Amino acid sequence: FGHNDEKKDSTRYTVPGGSFDDNLRRFVNETRAKGGIPVLFNSIVRRNFISPDDKDMKIDARKEPGAATKPVEGNVLYDTHGAYLESPRRVAKELGVAFVDMNKITHDLVQGMGPVESKKLFMWVQPQTVPAIPQGREDNTHLNVYGARVVAKLAVQAIAKEVPALAGYVRYYDYVVAKDGSGDFFTVQEAIDAVPDFRKGVRTTILIRKGVY
């Protein structure tokens, strides 16, 4: 929660410490009323390697690649969420529910990858590669299919740690095969060939998603 609450659009904007917290309390209470176990996250990071003084990166970046106004990126990942990061933590403590600091988890991921490699996680599309967006896209907020899988895996690991009752339901795979590009490989044979020699005596688990191979 938090990305869209930051928008100044009156239909989506909420105030951290006020209406944003109230919404989180409502979500927790309604979930509990249905017998569910609520887990609150804070926002994942934006891929923002630009100084906070540059307002251009505080919005969803969907500029055409190569635009002359594109700011110069550095090597330090900067926060864009501010007080919105603390609301889920505060409400979780107040109501006694599990909290996952997805901001820190994704910050460590994106900062560790750096400004170049981290583009692989987000909707960075080269011009003339996708018919729907021939001009390409440089979106530093929304994850692509691969990035979503990477972050989802980290989220599941964190949930299992914070809510031990769910840990037994988590399934771990060494490789994932998927036709839509959401896995590590497109074919089963590629995944088999990727198993290193030193794992020959160790079980390697490969998840094969639905499809014809």
Q: Where on the chain are the PLM-derived regions?
A:
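Low-complexity, Pro/Thr/Ser/Gly/Ala-rich linker/spacer regions in secreted
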Residues: 167-174
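Acidic helix-start/capping segments at beta-turn-to-alpha-helix junctions
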Residues: 48, 209-211
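Extracellular beta-strand scaffolds
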Residues: 183, 212-213
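Alpha-helical cap/lid subdomain in secreted, periplasmic
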Residues: 1-145, 149, 153-164
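Residues within well-ordered beta-strands of beta-sheet-rich folds
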Residues: 37, 207-209
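Acidic Gly/Asp/Thr-rich repetitive segments characteristic of extracellular carbohydrate-active
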Residues: 175-207
